Amino acid sequence: LNHVALTCIDGAMHRYLDEIGYPVDNPVSIQMPVNLRRDDDSDGGNKLGIALVDLAGPAGDRWERHQEIGFKLRNVKNQVFSVPGNSFEQFTIMIAGISEVLEKLGLSDKLPGNGHTVVSNVPGPVRKLYVKGSEVERMYPISTLAPGLRMNITLFSYADVLHFGIVATQDMVSLQTLADYIVEEFRELERERG
């Protein structure tokens, strides 16, 4: 799921950034929450870290980009779990703190970023839900922007349907265009691969 969704988001981001006057010749870098819970971990609560992931470059067909993104995601997981103990959690907290300080000082736009977009995938209910007998037709995620971020794209699954929520800063205009591009990229990937 992540490979397909990120391939569609990647293609859509390149098209969107080009359209609003910020063409990107390199892979788009995103921040991606990573589950840090190990199989033998019996502690309660969430254990998350943020990994920086370079998606695919703008060249190549969708299937090549899909394969490249899948390779990069596997590498990220291997790197995250090769770090001892809770080092990755501590690294995430440190980066978040630095981002907040840079935002407060007004420097976050003047220094190279750590990926100005976060993309997360939140698993939702696998079966339909009902409220007082009425079926809940859709569930959309509501997200926020952490310091240093320009955009947050959250995927939320509900009863075998994937919904996207997109929030961004005011300078990221025409988010509906980005949403339309994500859908178009999915349809094209599906058409190309049958």
What is the predicted role of each segment?
Residues 1, 38, 54-60, 168-173:
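A generic structural motif
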Residues 1-42:
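Hydrophobic "lid/gating" helix adjacent to the active-site nucleophile
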Residues 2-7, 11, 26, 45, ...:
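Conserved structured core elements
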Residues 17-20, 104-107, 140-142, 151-154:
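Generic recognition of flexible, low-complexity loop/linker segments
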Residues 113-187:
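Low-complexity, glycine/alanine/valine/leucine- and proline-rich hydrophobic stretches
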Residues 7-19, 54, 72, 76, ...:
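Generic, well-ordered alpha-helical scaffold segments in large soluble proteins
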Residues 42-125:
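Helical lid/core segments from catalytic subdomains that handle acyl or acyl-like groups
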